[in-house]
């Protein structure tokens, strides 16, 4: 079974949690795209749900698949958000943002009663940090922001190289990647993040940092698909505790 099939299996398992009348957060990325496609099939069969997309790419996918959409300005909460992750640790802390939608993804996850993370089992790691940590920044004053980030790294016991993300493919290939919100992303190769909550707090306090890819205490459960089947891991403490 290839990686794409595993991702679709995880998406199908998460779809079992969806009930008629739910308001859903729709994640971004290759695994979340499988969920949107499968959800569209259920909608075509009569399921009544409404979704909030976390990116323009997901909005286009959901529209193509016939999933009704709304915004967080029009509804007061979401029942479930289903999204992928770049890394998941045993505490269900995440690194997200490989697709560049981390800001909207975090807003939507925080507005949800539950966040279900779907992934193939290669995303399960003992410690976060092998995957580069995305940090969304305002382009103005980037040098000062980078220096403040490096100071935060040192205070939190990590170090590594940062690079401004470049777009890949299409007519923007090689140019600076720009998020849906008009920001840039610094990808930090840290190797091992010894204390994700402390680093998350330090990064959030830096002027010029819009958001970062550490999702701490947001995931309620993770659905991991591998060669031996599906594993569902619940967070030890309920969201909000």
From Swiss-Prot:
Belongs to the ribose 5-phosphate isomerase family. Keywords: Isomerase. SUPFAM superfamilies: D-ribose-5-phosphate isomerase (RpiA), lid domain (SSF75445), NagB/RpiA/CoA transferase-like (SSF100950). This is Ribose-5-phosphate isomerase A. It catalyses: aldehydo-D-ribose 5-phosphate = D-ribulose 5-phosphate. Substrate binds at residues 28-31, 83-86, 96-99, 123. It comes from Bradyrhizobium diazoefficiens (strain JCM 10833 / BCRC 13528 / IAM 13628 / NBRC 14792 / USDA 110). Pathway: Carbohydrate degradation; pentose phosphate pathway; D-ribose 5-phosphate from D-ribulose 5-phosphate (non-oxidative stage): step 1/1. The active site is at 105 (proton acceptor). Catalyzes the reversible conversion of ribose-5-phosphate to ribulose 5-phosphate. PANTHER family: RIBOSE-5-PHOSPHATE ISOMERASE 3, CHLOROPLASTIC-RELATED. One of its GO terms (molecular function) is ribose-5-phosphate isomerase activity. It comes from the Bacteria. Coiled coil: none annotated. Homodimer. GO terms for biological process: pentose-phosphate shunt, non-oxidative branch. Its EC number is 5.3.1.6.
